[in-house]
Swiss-Prot record:
Keywords: Disulfide bond, Hemostasis impairing toxin, Secreted, Signal, Toxin. Residues 1-23 form the signal peptide. This is Snaclec 6. Residues 32-143 form the C-type lectin domain. Belongs to the snaclec family. It comes from Daboia siamensis (Eastern Russel's viper). Gene3D superfamilies: Mannose-Binding Protein A, subunit A. It is found in: Secreted. Disulfide bonds join 25-36, 53-142, 119-134. It holds the Pfam family Lectin_C.
Amino acid sequence: MGRFISVSFGLLVVFLSLSGTGADCPSEWSSHEGHCYKVFKLLKTWEDAEKFCTEQKKGSHLVSLHSREEEKFVVNLISENLEYPATWIGLGNMWKDCRMEWSDRGNVKYKALAEESYCLIMITHEKVWKSMTCNFIAPVVCKF
C-alpha cells in the first residue's frame, strides 16, 4: 500500500510539472513561454496562411514574434521541420494606412502606386524579416 501511494504521488508530481509546458498544447504542436506553435509545409499566400491558421485552433494566427528568444525558438522549430528558406510571419499590410511624403517635403498629390500590399516573411537562416508581396507563397507557422 505504501509503495502504491509513493508511485501515485510520483506520477502526480510528474503530471503537475508538465502542466504549463507541452502538456497544454495539442499533439504535434510545440510549446514555448505559454504559447503553442506549429510549422506547416503548405505553401500559401499571406492572406490564405492567416485564414488557415485561424481555422487550426481557436485563437491561432500566423506567428507573432515578441522577443529574440521567441524568434530563436521559432527559427529552430522551422529548421527542424522545413528546408524552405522563408516563412510567413503575422505582420502584414503594414503600409496600407501610412502617410507618404516626398523626400523634398512636397505634398503627395499624384500617385501611380500598384495596389499591391506588402507582408513580412522571415528569412530563416539569416534571422531577418523582409517585406514581400502578400501574393508570394511561403510555408506557414501558426501560433496560439
